[in-house]
Amino acid sequence: RMAIYYIHRMPAIQAWKTQTVPDMGYDHNTYPCKIIGATIRNEVLVAKEFPLLAEEAITMAKNAATFLIDMSRPEGAPLAFFPPTYYLDYVSSKRDWNQGKTMTLEACAAGHAFLDLYDYTGDQLYYNRAIGIADTYLKLQREDGSYPIKVDFVTGEPVNEVRAMLHPLLNYVLRLHNQYGLTKYDSIAEKGEKWMNEVAVEAFNMTGQFEDVSVLGLEPYENLTNCTAAPYASYLLNKENITEIDLQNAKDLIRLSEDQFTFWDIVPNEHGVKRFAAPCVVEQYKYWTPVDASAHNVSMAFLDLYEVTGDPLALAKAKALI
């Protein structure tokens, strides 16, 4: 509760009380889907957890949602209803290779935000935006079930042939099915999961899809990350009917996340100094740095494994990383 309250009280977040554009004093607002989508979700949580702040929090969430809607591609466009990955020229948004581009799966973050706001307010506007995003994903999916990792924000043309890791979209479709009874998008999950298992997992090429790291010229295995491996393991372990193949794939992905990115301890250097505080989880090959979100990814995967298998070691590892 204190974490969401802390975020709520940040000056750049408080700015949403009176405006419908982001306060760029917090320069990560340059990533609308990811950060402003998360802001909306945070404020809905604040409204639920702190009733005295509910009116203020929902006003902030609605203003942030207005910004995402205003920035979204229009109906009929190749990326209809998608808000952008990048805004203005802060941080990585200023890079030439990001100008006018968008990460294909980041609209899922905005979709979840719209659904959270709809759930709280009942305002059909937000539900319709979330469904519009899902409809666009239905149109964009390739015959083999895959999606390009990054595309032109106006034309929808891929920047290259690197494919996206699909756990964000699979979880989005799962929410639409389970919470709202929508089966229209089940084919996205069926085809997408098949591609993930037969291509990405089979090749063990769980590539990173970070908005601040270029995918131009990206070779297989060049930028592996727990941020795709561990969440997809969790997706498999949370299926209603888990097959033996699902379980084995999940275990392998967790092993990848532990072996390549998790430090249970650090050998001190000649001066007795440890490079990192351990245990920790580094994010990706191209950003070899401990990140809390990565620790969360791997911890949740271990916890999901424990809940399926009862393995006490998996539970111990999950607890250690938190």
Which residues fall in each region the model found?
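Glycan-recognition and catalytic cores of secretory/periplasmic carbohydrate-active enzymes
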Residues: 1-322
